[in-house]
A protein has these predicted regions:
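Glycosyltransferase-associated regions of secretory-pathway enzymes
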Residues: 2-185
Length: 185
């Protein structure tokens, strides 16, 4: 935490964008009792089933769920600035997430209150190491470094995909990433 959230809290319920257009409740949030929006979020999760053996590409994060629900309420993912949606102030990334996930670079502004450090506790140790390698290479060599890190980590991701979905899952995922076009092997 860079500074007290008292000023933000005094303005009412809030959420923050992880990146422009993607709201992450894990960055921090405030609510008043019985807010309809949060009832919708809880209801969504109450009616879900979780099967971690499923294809991880089918698993949707809380970021996507919350963002989708906010869009239904009028949230504009392209808007630059603070939006008030369903009685909730949605703050841009500079407020609670000034760290670039891909480079690790932190850009503080006069609006920064907290820094989300992306501990990625849900990932395996090797997945965290692969992401850290991507961050370092992206910072040092730009997008070419990030692509190289992706290539270095690719055998692990293919192995993981095969372990959970079999060879068919690997081919289907590769095809999706290739916009449905035939993949030449």
């Amino acid at each position: 935490m860079i500074r007290s959230l008292d000023e933000i809290i005094a303005k009412g319920p809030f959420l923050g964008e992880q990146v422009k257009g993607r709201v992450n409740a894990g960055l921090g949030m405030a609510a008043e009792p019985d807010m309809e929006f949060y009832k919708r979020v809880v209801n969504l999760y109450d009616n879900m089933t979780f099967d971690l053996s499923q294809d991880s590409n089918k698993q949707v994060t809380v970021v996507q769920h919350v963002t989708d629900l906010l869009i239904e309420c009028g949230y504009d993912p392209q808007f630059d600035g603070i939006q008030t949606i369903c009685g909730i102030n949605i703050y841009p990334p500079q407020y609670f997430n000034p760290q670039d996930f891909k480079t690790g670079v932190i850009t503080l502004t006069e609006n920064t209150y907290t820094i989300h450090h992306f501990a990625e506790s849900w990932k395996t140790p090797i997945e965290r190491k692969l992401h850290n390698m991507e961050v370092v290479m992206n910072r040092k060599y730009g997008s070419k470094g990030a692509k190289l890190a992706y290539i270095i980590g690719l055998p692990y991701w293919v192995y993981k995909k095969m372990k959970t979905t079999g060879i068919k899952g690997v081919v289907v995922t590769a095809r999706k990433k290739n916009n449905g076009k035939q993949i030449k092997m």
